[in-house]
Amino acid sequence: MRRLLTPWRGVAAGFLLNGILLGTWASRVPAVMGHFHVAKASFGVLLLLLGLGALISFPITGRLSDSLGAVRVARMIAIPFLVSIAALGLAPTIPLLAIALFLFGMCHGSMDVAVNSWASEVEKHMGRPVMSSFHAMWSVGAVLGAAGGYIATVFQTPVYVHFLVTAVTIGGLLGPFLLLDWQSTIRTHESGAVGLVLPNSGLFLVGLIALASGLGEGTALDWSAVYLHDVVGTEESDAALGYMGFSAAMVMMRLKADSLVTRWGSATVARISGFSAVFGILLIVLGETLPLVVAGFVLMGVGYAAVLPLAFSRAAADLVVPAGKAIASVAIFAYGAMTLGPFAIGLLAEAATMRLCFFIVGLFAALVAVLAPVLKQ
């Protein structure tokens, strides 16, 4: 058992690191906006740079993971990733903040691809499903990052101090686990670019489900703290509670998701997930108090936790399109929504209200419940 747990710990450390740094950033968004006096629309453009950095990194890191080995790439990315979170706190001007966000997004996307590739190797080595446990570790990291942000704001810690301390501490605690012994599979690519395929009708509907989930997750990450601060009127420290509750709920649901799918089936779990997300967003939109709105974010977390894993599993089982291309096609919907969704919300929030923005996200969440039958395998 110890022999099997050793590689698991290494991958889990990579997921934890990714989640902690994203949660750390998300929890201090209102502070960064206030420091630079940035309007929501302008900040949406900055968030777009973060997402674009991640999207650009996906194909690059995928090829590097194949040619160099996923574990080696994860180790190579770890230090620049830690440096990038520190740079976000130290950036003195908006242009430098934009550059730091783009680099932070690239490091986040690169680490995401590398540790998922590494996780698939370890899962095969262990001989049983463990992927959900790794994604749960990402959510644990996000909760820890958000909790750190809450503590930092309570004690009025400057953003640059908070981010620097986080980078040094997390690097020291998790770095050794990334160095645990593991030999990744090395693959060679044939000449020519690896392209995506246009999804068939079934995969297109799966893609819409992934889009709805990606939009919800991206909105919670980038705008939950702003919503609580600006709409509900909470203190900056309490604004971190929304994403903390969202992430904590995702942890618990992801730890249970595999057993629920075995018992009820993919479609039923997806349908219940969609209803949970819709109800949670209604609480957020209609709620006027901190406990009620945080409860809404918790239900959002429960609702979105299992959706993307179910969508990718359905894509991999497609009878027409090969698994790799099918997953890549569906991933474009999810990551495109995570990238463009927060940007669009920033623009819409300037023209309308944040409540309307979240209501629209809820309409997309309803698609998950409606389209759930397409996830049957």
From Swiss-Prot:
Membrane is among the record's keywords: yes
Q: Which family does it belong to?
A: To R.meliloti MosC.
Q: Which SUPFAM superfamilies match?
A: MFS general substrate transporter
Topology of the protein relative to the lipid bilayer: Multi-pass membrane protein
- UniProt subcellular location: Cell membrane
Which InterPro entries does the record cross-reference, listed alphabetically? Answer: MFS, MFS_dom, MFS_trans_sf, MFS_Transporter
Q: What name has this protein been given in UniProt? A: Uncharacterized transporter y4wD
